[in-house]
Curated annotation (Swiss-Prot):
Family membership noted in the UniProt record: Belongs to the class-III pyridoxal-phosphate-dependent aminotransferase family. HemL subfamily.
Pathway(s) per entry: Porphyrin-containing compound metabolism; protoporphyrin-IX biosynthesis; 5-aminolevulinate from L-glutamyl-tRNA(Glu): step 2/2
PANTHER family for the chain: GLUTAMATE-1-SEMIALDEHYDE 2,1-AMINOMUTASE, GLUTAMATE-1-SEMIALDEHYDE 2,1-AMINOMUTASE 1, CHLOROPLASTIC-RELATED
GO biological process: one example: protoporphyrinogen IX biosynthetic process
UniProt-recorded name of the protein: Glutamate-1-semialdehyde 2,1-aminomutase
Gene Ontology terms: cellular component: cytoplasm
Keywords from the UniProt entry: Cytoplasm, Isomerase, Porphyrin biosynthesis, Pyridoxal phosphate
Annotated GO MF terms: glutamate-1-semialdehyde 2,1-aminomutase activity; pyridoxal phosphate binding; transaminase activity
Cofactor: pyridoxal 5'-phosphate
Length: 429
């Protein structure tokens, strides 16, 4: 028995399911999860001393790779001064100013501890500001695990095949309306049905928890217009896409300003973090300046602020995103070429340092159903065979993958060689 397997069995006796987040349990691919002990650059090492090229990157935060020296130095500099004070620090201001200077829609920002906190607070703020209760989300979009947002959600809920979750009363979700991603007509119909009741529309501008799906620009523009028409707020959940698809987020890339933006992952440089920001008059509705309450013991803690600030300073450097996008494109091209050589249909796409692929003969993937109809059995076989070759992809076909600045031509070539070997073996099996 491997040490990973031994640890997993031990973990199951004390931790529900043996993991502290469902997708880690490998339910989406079968088998037992790998336990890791260290990471450096583009690589992870497991507890059995096997090394892997890492395309998960802690689910997005590690855009600079594992243990980047600038991030380690920044954390070390504050570590010895105190890990948390429960009081304001100058680092909070510095990170807030840096984010606001880069994210087009943000004039004020509130730091929290996770993406879930950020989206939960954003919905509360939108309801308080508009004095309306209903909101629209999209089937398969995942916005964390707060009660009102766990309706037809993505991420681990898709892996487990659960459309919602027990433990949430109907009275909480009755104000949550859903539509299909990239379907503007459905959104318009909801606004027509509830013209005075919808506080906000929330979406991942580039979904990454129901597979990797690129938005139609007309869809995003249409959402902005509908929200303006019906006096509703538009929330971009950029926890995943913020500083991942481009220096100014998805909103900068597509030229569309939301009213509220939620952030996480990269702005903490690998530390637990979240944030929400937006127009000054909306953000001023948050306590203690306004009536909408939100609080957090560890919000703005020095370690996360230091790691996030160091990360943002690195990704600001000239050609950072040009190089990152080039590497990610090379990866998806390599996967596509390997599949084509094996005569196996595969769709792959990328944006910035974010990518996804699924085994389908479709020429485009536009919503959750397109991903769900792809070959999940083949994905599971491919995942495990690539893992055996030392390539670690997300253990679910519903999760996006991530490339860091530490991935280079060597890692792409190794991935291509492994994929070509694996896909040809699967084809002949």
């Amino acid at each position: 028995m491997s040490r990973s397997s031994d640890l997993f069995h031990k973990a199951q006796t004390i931790i529900p399911g043996g993991v502290n987040s469902p997708v880690r349990a490998f339910k989406g691919v079968g088998g037992e999860p790998v336990f890791f002990k260290s990471g450096k650059g583009a690589y992870l090492t497991d507890v059995d001393d096997k090394q892997y090229i890492d395309y998960v990157g802690s689910w997005g935060p590690l855009i600079l790779g594992h243990c980047h020296p600038k991030v380690i130095e920044a954390v070390d500099n504050v570590l010895h001064s105190g890990m948390s004070f429960g009081a304001p620090t100058e680092l909070e201001i510095q990170l807030a100013e840096k984010i606001a200077s880069l994210m087009p829609s943000i004039e004020k920002i509130r730091m929290v501890n996770s993406g879930t906190e950020a989206t939960m607070t954003a919905i509360r703020l939108a309801r308080g500001f508009t004095n309306k209760n209903k909101f629209i989300k999209f089937n398969g979009c995942y916005h964390g695990h707060s009660d009102s947002l766990l309706v037809k959600a993505g991420s681990g809920l898709l892996t487990l095949g659960i459309p919602s979750t027990p433990g949430i009363p109907q009275c909480i979700t009755e104000h949550t309306l859903t539509a299909d991603f990239n379907n503007l007509e459905q959104v318009a119909q909801l606004f027509e049905k509830y013209p005075n009741d919808i506080a906000t529309v929330i979406l991942e501008p580039v979904p990454g928890n129901m597979g990797f799906i690129l938005p139609k620009i007309e869809f995003l523009k249409g959402l902005r217009e509908l929200c303006d028409q019906y006096n509703a707020l538009l929330i971009f959940d950029e926890v995943m896409t913020g500083f991942r698809v481009g220096l100014h987020g998805a909103q900068g890339l597509f030229g569309i300003k939301p009213d509220i933006t939620t952030l996480g992952k990269i702005i903490g440089g690998g530390m637990p973090v979240g944030a929400l920001g937006g127009k000054r008059e909306i953000m001023s509705f948050l306590a203690p300046e306004g009536p909408v309450y939100q609080a957090g013991t560890l919000s703005g803690n020095p370690l996360a602020m230091a790691a996030g600030l160091a990360t943002l300073k690195e990704i600001e450097k000239i050609n950072f995103f040009e190089d990152l996008s080039s590497t990610t494109n090379k990866l998806t091209e390599a996967l596509s070429d390997a599949a084509e050589n094996a005569n196996i249909p595969l769709f792959a796409a990328s944006l910035g340092g974010m990518f996804g692929f699924c085994f389908t003969d479709k020429n485009s993937v536009e919503n959750y159903l397109d991903v769900a109809s792809s070959d999940e059995v083949l994905f599971k076989k491919f995942f495990h065979a690539m893992l055996a070759q030392g390539v670690y992809f997300a253990p679910s076909m519903y999760e996006a993958g991530f490339v860091s600045s530490m991935h280079g031509d060597l890692e792409i070539q190794k991935t291509y060689d492994a994929a070509e070997l694996v896909l040809n073996q699967l084809k002949s099996a």
